Amino acid sequence: MSGAESYRHITVLLNEAVDALAVREDGVYVDGTFGRGGHSRLILSRLGDAGRLIVFDKDPQAIAVAEELARSDKRVGVVHGGFASFQTALDGLGIGKVDGALFDLGISSPQIDDGSRGFSFRFDAPLDMRMDTTRGMSAAEWIAVASEQDLHEVIKNYGEERFSRQIVRAIVAQRAESPIDTTRKLAQIVAQNVRTRERGQDPATRTFQAIRIFINRELEEVGAVLPQVMCRLKEGGRLAVIAFHSLEDRIVKQFVKKYSQHEPLPSWAAVREADLPDPPLKIVGRALKPGEAEIAANPRARSAVLRVAERTAGPIPE
């Protein structure tokens, strides 16, 4: 097995997410988070010869798998980069409107389970945490130079960590003596400063999650891509997003809610709401979570939430 394929990945909500796209044989679709291609391969199985699938990923290992797939299937186009470049990338490929876009947010199992990537406190490895290891600042580099206030804001806001102040003070004290450059060093600092343990959760979980989200600009990218997708969806096109973190899901939920209803009209308005054009999005079904069987087979699916919206003929507000 190659390095790109040696870590098992179970795609979460596989059929549900692809079913939500209502794939047309001749449609153009985007998988904004290729990973190891679970969703992409199922989409391809439902596309005809005239269909196209554009896949995005930051991770060089994921891109290696995607490019191998593209060599054997000419319907596939590959973008090495974050999905925040959605419209620019589609423009570069000569693609206008699309029939659907799927995003499976957060970190993949191969990234967690490859100790050398520095995402997990289960391994002693260089503290990297970059999804794209070819660019940007590693977690260790950021921890070395970040202000105490920045460290606190990231760990408190992105990790929702109650003991962020204590953790940050310990980080600042330790880095003055020696670099915090491995996952074990950071995990030990956190463990010594988290007074209350959550059942079934390592004390370092929230801090590692927070730093990873910050290093990879995960929340900013979600917020940036959603309006781009809305602009590029054809009428009837679908947006499907799987979120694993409450902050990600909140961004998706609020966006879809905002653009699936009208702004309240003032009492003096001369027009009735019924006379207004449709909002640009329509919510499709309820938020969907994995069933007990899927969670039993893949415990990492437990926190997943799938939300789906459909583009209407309504104009996008300026």
Curated annotation (Swiss-Prot):
Q: Which domain of life does the protein's organism represent? A: Bacteria
Q: What is its EC number?
A: 2.1.1.199
Q: Which UniProt keywords apply?
A: Cytoplasm, Methyltransferase, rRNA processing, S-adenosyl-L-methionine, Transferase
| One GO CC term, this protein | cytoplasm
Instruction: Write the signal peptide boundaries.
Output: none
Which molecular function terms from Gene Ontology are attached? rRNA (cytosine-N4-)-methyltransferase activity
The entry marks the following residues as binding S-adenosyl-L-methionine, namely: 37-39, 57, 83, 104, 111
Q: What class of enzyme is it?
A: transferase
Indicate where this protein is primarily found: cytoplasm
An example GO BP is:
rRNA base methylation
One of its Pfam families is Methyltransf_5
Annotated catalysed reactions: cytidine(1402) in 16S rRNA + S-adenosyl-L-methionine = N(4)-methylcytidine(1402) in 16S rRNA + S-adenosyl-L-homocysteine + H(+)
Question: Where is this gene product found?
Answer: Cytoplasm
- Similarity annotation: Belongs to the methyltransferase superfamily. RsmH family.
Cited function: Specifically methylates the N4 position of cytidine in position 1402 (C1402) of 16S rRNA.
Q: What is this protein called?
A: Ribosomal RNA small subunit methyltransferase H
Organism source for this protein? Neisseria gonorrhoeae (strain ATCC 700825 / FA 1090)
Taxonomy of origin reads: Bacteria, Pseudomonadati, Pseudomonadota, Betaproteobacteria, Neisseriales
What gene does the UniProt entry assign to this protein? rsmH
